[in-house]
Amino acid sequence: MLMNYSTLFKDNAKVAQVGIIGANGGFGYSFLAQVPRMQDSLSLRVICDLDMDVSRKLLESLKYDSSRFHPCRNQRDIEQALKTDDPIIILEDGTLLPFCKIDVLVEATGSPEVSSVMAQACLKQGIHVCMVSKEADCVSGPYLYNLAKQHNCVYAIAAGDQPANLIQLLSWVKMLGLEIIACGKSSEYDFVYDLETGVFEFQGQTAVLPDLADHWHLDGMQTLKQRSRILSDFPQFAVPDYCEMNVVSNATGLKPSCDRFHYPVCRVEELADIYIPVEDGGVLTKTGVVDVFNNLRRPDEASFAGGVFVIVRCHDEKVWSLLRAKGHVVSRNGKYACMYLPYHFMGVEAPLSVVNAFRLGLSTYDACTHQAIMLATAERDFKQGERMDLRGHHRLLDDVHVQLLSAQDAPVDAAPYYLIAGRTLTKDVRKGQTITIDMLDLDGSELERMYREGKNA
């Protein structure tokens, strides 16, 4: 998991010419802020977003040299820009990316169709792709992974987000020969509770909940039920969690623990007593699974929001007793332990994926196949002709419920959640129905073709 990067790259000092599309979001900003700090490894060649002026102002705010900026609207403009010294090409049209002589594309638009099409175009030209848009990856990732192999380049999910961090942690655990019982992540935002005042806080919302103090310490699974009940006015699941665990499942073969995840409200030190088999007092009816929890902490404790974890079986009583004495998270019965990374640093970490792809030909993945699918179920009656648009920062479909099923348990014709995005319904959908591919106008959808080919690969 940890390595000496100076040693790893000591015989390879090549500088990657990198492009980014979808640059004006949080991930894109953090990545662009990091690139100038890594001049021995990376050079920004292209920034692509919907508004050139916004992109230019973003680069200026990050102190990029404006003399390098070249707004380009066609291939001829790009050819002229490439004749200059160390240009930064500013695009609005992503179809021009393959002509910009980049080594690696960082794809961060968050648009499933656009992300997949842009990645495909670059991979076909031998350009490595680091995918930030998990909404695309969980649908087209297997296809793009295979396409990259065909063109002798790398397709990777970008470091700095939970899927890549968890995949990396899992690879470390597997290398150590430890048995994986469960793995997962914390949901995006912490549940913060002050035991002295009884004040609960979540995303700026507060409530006085004195009863929660009575269930602060874990006393069997009944404690989890009581916490969930007390916090019923606050959201205890999020669609992006399902998407991220879909990515992890496809990359590792680990299956969803259950259709809607357990989402316990719990503390990090409790994980090894919760994500264990039912017969040992936990929540799992099967092992080798992915899941999500809501992190409960005091105001004076560090955040775990967006952190990742793996539960392993303790293989030797003496070893794990020693580790428990050092403060590591070991279950009360001594049979299970939790290993975790309590962070994800977004674009600060993402350059490692770029450098690994360019210098070493390494991907986050060692496999990528359709192991799970996000099912979308109508929460109201929909009419033929309604358009299913994503909304908000978290890329949600209105009035649609999500589940994550293993591919073998899902209906054969089920439409992945993010394949539905931006599509028009071709027929009425009743409340409670699973949205299927034949209910969508997919005429001309490259994403649908990639999904189909990825399933059949």
Residue ranges and their predicted role:
Residues L50, G110, K134-D137, G160-D161, ...:
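Short, ordered loop/turn segments at secondary-structure junctions
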Residues V54, A136-Y145, Q162-L166, S187-F191, ...:
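Short gly/pro/ser/thr-enriched loop/turn and capping motifs at secondary-structure boundaries
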Residues L59-E60, G141-L144, I167-L170, F191-T197, ...:
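Short acidic, glycine/serine/threonine-rich loops at helix termini
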Residues H128-C130:
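A short hydrophobic/small-residue beta-strand
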Residues M1-A121:
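N-terminal glycine-/serine-/threonine-rich beta1-alpha1-beta2 phosphate-ribose binding loop
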Residues A148-K149, A156-R229:
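Rossmann-like NAD(P)H-binding beta-loop-alpha module
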Residues L2-K10, T206-A457:
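C-terminal catalytic/substrate-binding lobe primarily of soluble NAD(P)-dependent oxidoreductases
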Residues V114-A121, Q125, K134-C153, A158:
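Rossmann-fold NAD(P)-binding glycine/threonine-rich loop
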